[in-house]
Design a protein with these regions (language model features):
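Soluble non-cytosolic domains of exported or imported proteins
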Residues: 57, 84-88, 103, 157-162, ...
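Pocket-lining segment of extracytoplasmic ligand-binding domains
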Residues: 139, 189-283
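Secondary-structure end/capping motifs
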Residues: 247-329
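Short, glycine-/small- and polar/acidic-enriched structural segments
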Residues: 29-177, 184-187, 196, 203-209, ...
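Bacterial N-terminal signal peptides that target proteins for export
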Residues: 1-9
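Conserved C-terminal helix/tail region of periplasmic/extracytoplasmic solute-binding proteins
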Residues: 318-348
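Bacterial lipoprotein signal-peptidase II cleavage site
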Residues: 19-31
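Bacterial N-terminal signal peptides
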Residues: 9-18
């Protein structure tokens, strides 16, 4: 009799367990469905915006802070970030409509305008105020002068691109003729110059990060000068969109700019280490210490503005650089290619 009762109790316990487990599974699935539905509804309430960036670089830290901290979502934007690998490709994406907003050197907007584009691209937010590249030598040169480049070979950048034009601008400012006083090799792709230099090609190379830092860590090169410091304040990279897009989507552009400003504010108020930790998910192939080293280098040279306002004097300096490089026959009007409305509102 006792054995029979025990069996009945065991069967009852198993039934209750199965019933509870089934109920719990249903509740878990129901809770999961609610979470997924909430996430879907949230995404559906956001405005999709495709941003094409010229390159994916720690140089643009405030933008990545805005992404990682969720500032774009706070402003109602579901951001799709695409890397164009070159200002020409980024501009093509914006003009063709495959990207809503472009992030590139502002010289691209001047070129497009002067070529007669009807729905031309307008700059609405300036992120960086200094060049982000560095001159790397094969040996340490504690007391470097730009005249040390005379009769040397340097790995440069693409003709007509901002890295090369800023480099040549500095040379001219120091009495050096880029076409006569040294050899500038422009045959190597942007992303391959550091490797070429490490293999023994040239006496100097002009490098962005992490190329410059990696060469130093490998003891294959040494940073001897900052093009950002020696060229002065230059509107190196800015956000832009077609005139028609800005007119039709003013609220989106304002929200986008507001999100960027939050990123700018974060960078101004936090240490390089904190900034590095914030943007680390964007650079999974780079260790945190290297990211911090690079952020510190940019931080110390005052790379990032405290606002996004693209001032006229900066635009005119940019055109001076284009003219000195022989890339500009006709100056473009600031009032046509730049609007400060959104950045000014974001800064308040």
């Amino acid at each position: 009799m006792i054995k029979r009762i025990s069996v009945l109790l065991l069967l009852l316990a198993l039934s209750m367990t199965a019933l509870f487990g089934c109920s719990q599974t249903k509740e878990t699935k129901h809770a999961s469905a609610i979470i997924n539905t909430d996430k879907t509804n949230k995404e559906e309430n956001l405005t999709p915006v495709t941003l094409n960036e010229v390159a994916h670089s720690i140089f643009y830290a405030p933008m990545y802070v805005a992404i990682e901290k969720g500032y774009f979502e706070e402003e109602g934007i579901n951001l799709n970030l695409v890397t164009g690998f070159g200002a020409d490709k980024t501009m093509t994406a914006v003009i063709s409509g495959t990207a809503d907003i472009g992030f590139m050197g502002s010289e691209a907007s001047i070129y497009a305008y002067n070529e007669g584009a009807n729905d031309y691209v307008v700059n609405f937010a300036q992120l960086t105020q200094r060049a982000g590249n560095f001159l790397v030598a094969r040996e340490e040169i504690p007391d470097f002068h730009w005249t040390d480049l005379k009769d040397k070979k340097v790995l440069g950048g693409r003709k007509g691109g901002m890295p090369e034009m800023v480099f040549e601008y500095i040379l001219r400012q120091n009495g050096i003729d880029p076409s006569k006083d040294l050899i500038i090799d422009q045959s190597i792709d942007f992303g391959s110059t550091a490797a070429a230099f490490a293999e023994g090609n040239a006496d100097f190379t002009v490098e962005f990060e992490p190329g410059a830092t990696n060469l130093e860590k490998e003891e294959k090169g040494y940073v001897v000068a900052s093009l950002g410091t020696d060229s002065g304040y230059v509107p190196y990279t800015a956000f832009s969109a077609k005139k028609s897009y800005i007119e039709k989507n003013a609220d989106v552009i304002q929200g986008f700019t507001d999100a960027l400003q939050k990123g700018m504010d974060y960078v101004q108020k936090h240490t390089p280490k904190e900034i590095a930790e914030a943007i680390a998910p964007q650079f999974k192939e780079t260790n945190l210490n290297t990211i911090e080293t690079i952020v510190s280098r940019y931080y110390e040279q005052d790379t990032w503005k405290d606002n996004l306002i693209f001032e006229k004097k900066s635009f005119e300096l940019l055109q001076d650089i284009l003219e000195s490089a022989g890339e500009l026959d006709t100056r473009a009007p600031y009032d046509e290619l730049v609007t400060t409305t959104f950045a000014e509102k974001a800064a308040k």
